[in-house]
A protein has these predicted regions:
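Conserved helicase NTPase motor core
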Residues: 1-27, 45, 49
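Short glycine-/polar-rich loops that comprise or flank the Walker A/P-loop
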Residues: 3-6, 12-14, 35-40, 76-80, ...
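Active-site flanking residues adjacent to catalytic metal/cofactor-binding acidic residues
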Residues: 11, 116, 247
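Short phosphate-engaging motifs
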Residues: 24-27, 49, 91, 121, ...
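ASCE P-loop NTPase helicase motor core
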Residues: 26-34, 56
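Helicase P-loop NTPase motor core
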Residues: 36-39, 44-134, 160
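Conserved helicase motor
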Residues: 116-119, 140-147
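Conserved helicase C-terminal RecA-like lobe
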Residues: 126-128, 147-299
Length: 299
């Protein structure tokens, strides 16, 4: 930077979870020491979650090094729930049952996420959901529009848009075009669902839809995939769902043994604040110390 002072920095020290990549809260917390004339604008209103969820998140942070509180502005909802199990298999069976009940009550599976500390946990959760026929998808680091299958679909749409009748039923044409990839292909279904949503917002041709896809690819703004989302706590950062289940919140997983405990606290905070309306946390065996600090289990 040299002597320049025209700089704007945006960040949340409570969500700094990548110290292994060199990111720590100190960069934000000590910014005014390096730039004493900087104006600090704190955004403390929590617009995503219910007050009950935000209160839990605040409690987690207050027990650590960061005294960072969010102010709830939404209407009240249900209290976050904590469930204990004697084994991981019993925990997974229960989660699958509860997710199934939530879907049967009329909740869109895309509004539900199950979060865990590691990818290995997600694979076990995936197996449990598959056993009872609950459609799901593991969120990976690979970007939607960079997937080989999606690239092929976009290429097919690009070719189809050349011959598409501008005054015809482009949605039917799109469905027929993507049938070659399989009627149950989750990526094709995501693109078709997006097309129907955009048609209500003024997208009226396959050419216009193609332009929208190209814009979204550039902005990394993918459509929602069908089914319940499974993601690691790291992978969930920046996302939100109405119903969130945090699985495997045991002492052996949270905090992770080789990770700094304060960063693990922030990681748990990130997971909690992904939930908009409902939050359920479960564990097998000894609970995470973070749950004890939050009063979700007896000391």
């Amino acid at each position: 930077m040299g002597k320049r002072e025209d700089i704007c920095v945006v960040g949340d020290p409570a969500q700094t979870i990548y110290s292994f990549a060199g990111a720590t809260p100190a960069f934000l917390l000590n910014f005014t020491k390096k730039y004493p004339d900087a104006e600090v604008i704190r955004l403390s209103a929590g617009y995503r979650s219910t007050p009950e969820i935000i209160n839990l998140a605040n409690t987690i942070l207050r027990s650590g090094e960061l005294g960072h509180d969010l102010d709830a502005v939404n209407s009240h909802g249900e209290l976050p729930k904590s469930s204990a199990f004697t084994s991981e298999s019993a925990e997974l069976i229960s989660i699958a049952e509860k997710v199934g009940e939530t879907i049967k009550s009329g909740i869109n599976p895309q509004a539900i996420a199950i979060l865990a500390r590691t990818n290995a946990q997600l694979e076990a959760i995936e197996d449990a959901l598959n056993l009872v026929g609950i459609e799901n998808q593991i969120r990976t680091a690979e970007r939607f529009f960079e997937r080989g299958a999606v690239r092929e679909m976009v290429a097919a749409i690009r070719s189809g848009s050349v011959l598409s009748d501008p005054k015809g039923d482009w949605l039917s044409e799109l469905r027929d075009l993507l049938k070659q990839f399989g009627e149950n292909d989750k990526f094709a279904r995501a693109l078709i669902q997006l097309a129907y949503e955009l048609s209500s917002d003024g997208i009226d041709s396959m050419r216009a839809f193609l332009r929208e896809l190209e814009d979204r690819a550039e902005q990394n703004n993918p459509p929602a995939l069908p089914g319940v989302t499974l993601a690691t706590l790291h992978g969930a950062k920046g996302l939100e769902w109405d119903w969130v289940f945090i699985a495997g919140a045991s002492a052996s997983n949270l905090p992770w043994a080789s990770a700094p405990i304060e960063e693990e606290r922030r990681l748990f905070y990130v997971g909690i604040t992904r939930a908009k309306r409902s939050l359920s946390i479960s564990y097998a065996g000894e609970p995470s110390p973070f749950l004890r600090e939050a009063g979700l289990v007896s000391a």
